[in-house]
Amino acid sequence: MSTSVFNRRWAALLLEALARHGVRHVCIAPGSRSTPLTLAAAANKSFICHTHFDERGLGHLALGLAKASREPVAVIVTSGTAAANLYPSLIEAGLTGERLVFLTADRPPELINCGANQAIRQNGLYASHPALSIDLPRPTTDIPARWLVSTVDSAMARLQHGALHINCPFAEPLYGGDEQQYADWSATLGDWWQGNHPWLREVDPHQVLKQPDWFFWRQKRGVIVAGRMSADEGEHLAQWAEMLGWPLIGDVLSQTGQPLPCADLWLAQPQAQKRLAEAQLVVQFGSSLTGKRLLQWQEQCQPQEYWLIDDLPGRLDPAHHRGRRIRSSVAQWLELHPAQPRTPWADELTMLADNALDAVSGHLVNRFGEAQLAHRLPELLPENGQLFLGNSLIVRLIDALTRLPAGYPVFSNRGASGIDGLISTAAGVQRATAKPTLAVVGDLSALYDLNALALLRQCSAPTVLIVVNNNGGQIFSLLPTPEEDRQRFYCMPQNVEFSHAAAMFQLAYARPENWGQLLQAVEQGWRHGGATLIELQVPPSDGAQTLQHLVQQMTEQ
């Protein structure tokens, strides 16, 4: 038996089975043990192959591809710590629902727990974080091809959200051999190879049901909270809410156009709290809320019922309200639950929100820094493009200080909300859509994922990465951290600048010192055609202090 040839036969069937379930993008890291998988992916004309030398970044690249394409994406890595480096992206996918298929090559069983090189215990490596896991046996002709293909089919049919981990042990040799061998093993699947359907098709029994008392509830005083959703869903939800006459509080990721902008500011006002307390029903669409004041209100509100609607499974309400947890996409819900035109019941919230937006504009009119960037960000967005937001302070400033256009695509990693892999994820988002992309991250986030700048060299449309360099993790300036220890143990300033990083990866670079220069640099980036790194060096605590000042100003009104 030629082990190397049959390894490749086995891997080719495995990859073809994934292609039948909509996998188009395959992300590959270098490695020898994963050779059967890599060669099978390269030979399959259904796939677009992406490569990266860092498995942690590779996993996040796949995450970005899955976010923007809304399709399952496969990842191939070798054995050992290469597999462990996928953990952060796997965790994020589990929380935000992107479908990722992690194919981890492994040593065969006889090389585990005996001191063999690059051999770790990969079975169950990711604990409970994958939605599904398959531990494949060592490839052998004793196992029929129909077992392998139906095993993959069954798992992919059940993979509605999160990650599938397929551990793939391969024995040596991994190279060479007569490629014509073992054709009879593959041929047992007959004309399946000439089609494009799965071998085994399972029917999803999940069905969204119309709430029978919706006619009753839609006549009540309701509030809509909009979390993470698609651009189309955000637009339609805003129209639905307007027809109902219900106030809509939109998160930065809601893409609703935030009819009540600056919610993280005006929610600090007692007048707003009092009016919202009159709501009889709160309906939240999507999870992953960003603003502190919104999260506080969400926890403290006491309507008669609280409905949370999201296609993700599980409990998504940390406040544990009385009400209903309904698994549905926003689009499905709106189709089944039509709005009834009604007079708005909380018009004064519109006044409070508009006043908050005016207060922000007035406060920042002659200031240049990360707060002004957040407030005027819509001016920088590329036409027919998309926006990727980092975590920590910058996403909170954008959520609190501006109003993004309705239906404009916004992406972020707001599941576990880590600062790792953000540039890699943005690169994946760009590749999936081939749209002009604006990404905004902080300096520590950029340092954490610095080698992902290599991925931006291959962007298919103009891409601008703005690095807000406030010299450390200034999100901690918003928290009651011990002042004497804040810089050393929390903010951890690194005193770096990014021109050398841009030069290392052959990216265009600019460091504007005022708004006019920033606008010019961004516009040049859209004309440039490749990737541009724009570094915004700002006073360390200016953004945090601006947000605190504006919240205090709202509280006193």
Swiss-Prot record:
GO terms for molecular function: 2-succinyl-5-enolpyruvyl-6-hydroxy-3-cyclohexene-1-carboxylic-acid synthase activity; magnesium ion binding; manganese ion binding; thiamine pyrophosphate binding. Pathway: Quinol/quinone metabolism; 1,4-dihydroxy-2-naphthoate biosynthesis; 1,4-dihydroxy-2-naphthoate from chorismate: step 2/7; Quinol/quinone metabolism; menaquinone biosynthesis. The keyword Signal does not apply. GO terms for biological process: menaquinone biosynthetic process. Keywords: Magnesium, Manganese, Menaquinone biosynthesis, Metal-binding, Thiamine pyrophosphate, Transferase. Its EC number is 2.2.1.9. It catalyses: isochorismate + 2-oxoglutarate + H(+) = 5-enolpyruvoyl-6-hydroxy-2-succinyl-cyclohex-3-ene-1-carboxylate + CO2. Its cofactor is Mg(2+); Mn(2+); thiamine diphosphate. The keyword Transferase applies. Catalyzes the thiamine diphosphate-dependent decarboxylation of 2-oxoglutarate and the subsequent addition of the resulting succinic semialdehyde-thiamine pyrophosphate anion to isochorismate to yield 2-succinyl-5-enolpyruvyl-6-hydroxy-3-cyclohexene-1-carboxylate (SEPHCHC). This is 2-succinyl-5-enolpyruvyl-6-hydroxy-3-cyclohexene-1-carboxylate synthase. The lineage of its organism: Bacteria, Pseudomonadati, Pseudomonadota, Gammaproteobacteria, Enterobacterales.
